[in-house]
Amino acid sequence: MQFGVHLPHFGPFVSREGLRRFAQRADALDFHSVWASDHIAWPQHIDSLYPYTTTGEWPAHDPWMPRLDAIGTLLFVAGCTERVRLGTTVLVLGYRPPVQTAKLWSTLDVVSGGRAILGVGVGWMREEFEVLGMPSDHRGARADEQLEIFERLFAEHAPAYAGRFYRFPPIGFEPKPVRGRIPVWVGGHAPAALRRAGRAGDALHAAHVSPETLAGQWAEVRRHCAEAGRDPGAMELSVRLGLDYAGTSARPNALSGEREAMLARITEYAAVGTSHLLLDITGDSVDGLIRDMERFADEVVPALTH
C-alpha cells in the first residue's frame, strides 16, 4: 500500500517555511504523495450540506481562515521536493474554465518532472460557485466535458472541442504533460461520480468512508469500467482518512488509537482493494503534524509495505 499526506496549506499556522518543512519531510520519509484541497473563497453563510459528515456541517468552515490556493501550493512544493507525487483532493472542476485548468496542470507536471496527479470532483458548495461567478448547475455533465477536453489538450496537436457547455476552435496547446497525460483520480460517492471514475478515471479517490461502504463503491466503479470496455484491473483505489492520535477529529472513520488498532483498520481497507491511503492529519501546529507523520511512518508504514 502507498501512503500520502495532506499538506498544511490552510489553517492558523500556514506559512512558507512550515509548508516547505512538511513537504520535504514527507519526501524524505518516502511518502508516495502530498495533496492539497481546493477552496478559493469562503462565504460567511453556507446552506449547502457538506457530504462527508453525518450532520452536513463543514468542519473547516471559517471564512477568515488562511488558505493557500491548491495549485499554487503544489507548484511551490514541486520546487522544494524531488520525488513525492503532487495531487489535489480534489480539484473542483467547475471553479475554473477547462483550458485554463489544463494549462495549470500541464505546467505543474512539467516543472515537477511528471509528478502530478489530477484529483477531481464536481464540488458541493453552491455558494462558492456563486462567489466565483461560475455556474453550479449541471456540475456532473460539465465535469464530464472538462475531462474530455483535458484528454484532447494533452494528446492532440491542434485540439478543438464543441460540446454542450464548452467549445473552442483548433488551438495550440504546449507543452504537453511529461508522460503524455496526467493520471485522473475521481472523487465523490454519488452514483454519477462512481460512473465517472469507471469510465474516465485512473482511480477512485474516496473520502472518509468505512471499508464496507468503500467495497460497494469500488464494485460499482469496476462494473462501470468493464462496461466502458476498460480494464478494471488497471484501476487504483484510494481513500482519504483522518489520522488523529489525539482522538479529537470530527471526521468519520478517522484512524486513531495505538499501532495495532490502526494496522487492523487499515488491513480492512486493504482487503477491499485499497492501494493508496491519504492521511488527513489532525493537529494544531506544523511541528505536531510532522511528529504524527513521522510516528506513522515509523510505527505503521513498515508493517504494510513489506
Q: Residues of each region from the PLM?
A:
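Active-site-adjacent structural elements that line small-molecule/cofactor binding pockets in enzymes
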Residues: M1-H306
